[in-house]
Structures are given as structure tokens and as C-alpha cells.
């Protein structure tokens, strides 16, 4: 019984890792990804149990919704939102989830959520596949990859950081870099 539980727990953990890495089988999910998921299901991974692990509390849901509601559509293709993360546990995670959700808006190529927290602005940048957010975040000293990237800005206000981002997006667009 104990070893079966251990195997099941490990299968759940690995399956949840696949869900996170592929954004629920949306990004970079190939045949081998699905084969691995099927193997883990046969090994005891439970989709319902794993899904319950990813639930968020009501306060985080409300904050994420407020971030989405506050978003500005910039240049008809970028969703940008800001939020003060002080006194919010897991503020950067909530910001990243909001950035993911903003990609569901039709016509949005990239989403950016700027979170102010402890004298730093954390930028979560997301895209589906039409925009390389890594090259944008590299302009701010950050990094990541094609569809998920981030940066941290010091000694700048939330509003100034948003304006810097807009300026960078406009310039890169005009130069044909994005």
C-alpha cells in the first residue's frame, strides 16, 4: 500500500509538472508529451486530484480578475496591466496568472502584467506564439523564452515602468523587431 501511494504521488507530481510546462497541453505539447501523460495516468496520476492542487483561493481570484479588468489594450495587440502587490501573498504568481489569462482576449499577441512589490517592479510577459516576449524582456535585463519571459526593474515607479514598456514596444514594432 505504501509504495503504491508513493508511485501515485510521484505520478501526480510529474503530471502536474507537464501541465505547468505546457500550460495545460497548449504550449510545446508534442506526441511525446501526450505519451508521457498517458504513461503517468496508467501509473496512477489522477487528473482530478492534480487539478484540485492548482485551485486558487478566492482572494487571489478576485485580485487576478481586478488586474484583468484594469488592463489596457495598447497598439491593438498588447494587453498591459499594473498592480500593487504589497500585502498580497504570492503577488508575482497572481500577476503571472493574470498575464496568462489576458492572452485569451481576441487579437492580443502579447500580455504584460507589472507588479510592484518591495521596491521592485516584476514584469510577467506572455504570448502564444506570434510574439517573442523574451527579446522584449531582454531590453529590461530580463529573459525567458518565446512565450514566457520576465524582468525585474529597480528604482522606477509602476507608472514609469509601464511607460517604459510602451515605449519599448512601440520602438521595437517600428523597427520591425516584433
Regions found by a protein language model. Give the residues of each.
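Short, small-residue-biased leader/transition segments that mark boundaries at the very start
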Residues: 1-7
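Active-site histidine-anchored catalytic micro-motif
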Residues: 9-14
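Hydrophobic helix-and-loop "lid/oligomerization" segment in the mid-to-C-terminal part
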Residues: 15, 20-178
